[in-house]
């Protein structure tokens, strides 16, 4: 009798284990099918009008079809301007995306990259150039408004000294974004590589991303 009970107990345990394993697998499959969202705003710091492209990436297809007309998500963005914000929905399992930029007029000067998205991401996609080479970079938006000042961070195409209120606060790194710095004067409170950065088109109390080069400001984008 004891042997029978032991046999039944073992069978029950094995059945429960199989059921729990099955539930776990189902849960993971469900997570992979959940709908996620991301937002991307496109910054064209190049010297020409540009189209920005986005397309879901798969391991098998690579960059195939990225520059097809159907993948344009922000068209005819003027030089040194910010394009529209693109809302992108995807299944959790398909969280890789290809991004590209090209000359709007010629269709040439193509640059591309890929990145992995997180649900709820709010991103800047920046097209920039250094020493004749074009690049795309993706950084997260980060609004940090401060009363009575311009709160700014800088994305640079090289290494430049940054002065705030006449004092050096940092040196930029190529393709990287700095921390935020509080600037109290819109006309001459900020200098990059010896160039005064005019912030007077902005508003006190707001935060901004500045794309800069050796000659100063190229794009000013509201966070």
For each predicted feature, which ranges?
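C-terminal motif of bacterial Sec signal peptides marking the signal peptidase cleavage site
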Residues: 18-22
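Bacterial N-terminal signal peptides that target proteins for export
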Residues: 1-10
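Tryptophan-paired
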Residues: 52-108, 163-204
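Bacterial signal peptide processing site
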Residues: 24-27
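Structured interaction patches on ligand/partner-binding surfaces of diverse proteins
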Residues: 102-134, 194-223
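Hydrophobic helical h-region of N-terminal Sec-dependent signal peptides
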Residues: 10-16
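Surface-exposed interaction/gating patches
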Residues: 36-49, 137-186
């Amino acid at each position: 009798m004891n042997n029978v009970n032991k046999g039944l107990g073992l069978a029950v345990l094995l059945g429960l284990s199989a059921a729990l394993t099955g539930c776990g697998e189902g849960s993971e499959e469900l997570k992979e099918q959940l709908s996620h969202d991301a937002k991307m705003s496109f910054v064209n710091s190049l010297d020409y009008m540009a189209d920005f492209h986005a397309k879901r990436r798969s391991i098998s297809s690579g960059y195939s079809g990225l520059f097809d007309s159907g993948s344009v998500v922000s068209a005819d963005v003027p030089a040194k301007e910010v394009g529209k914000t693109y809302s992108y929905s995807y299944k959790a399992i398909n969280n890789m995306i290809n991004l590209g930029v090209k000359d709007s007029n010629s269709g040439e000067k193509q640059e591309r990259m890929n990145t992995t998205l997180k649900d709820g991401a709010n991103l800047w996609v920046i097209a920039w150039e250094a020493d004749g080479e074009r690049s795309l970079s993706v950084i997260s938006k980060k609004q940090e408004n401060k009363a009575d000042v311009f709160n700014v961070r800088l994305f640079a195409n090289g290494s430049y000294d940054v002065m705030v209120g006449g004092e050096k606060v940092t040196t930029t790194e190529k393709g990287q974004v700095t921390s935020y710095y509080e600037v109290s004067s819109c006309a001459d409170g900020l200098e990059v590589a010896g160039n005064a950065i005019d912030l007077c088109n902005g508003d006190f109390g707001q935060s901004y991303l500045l794309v800069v080069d050796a000659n100063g400001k190229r794009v000013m984008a509201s966070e």
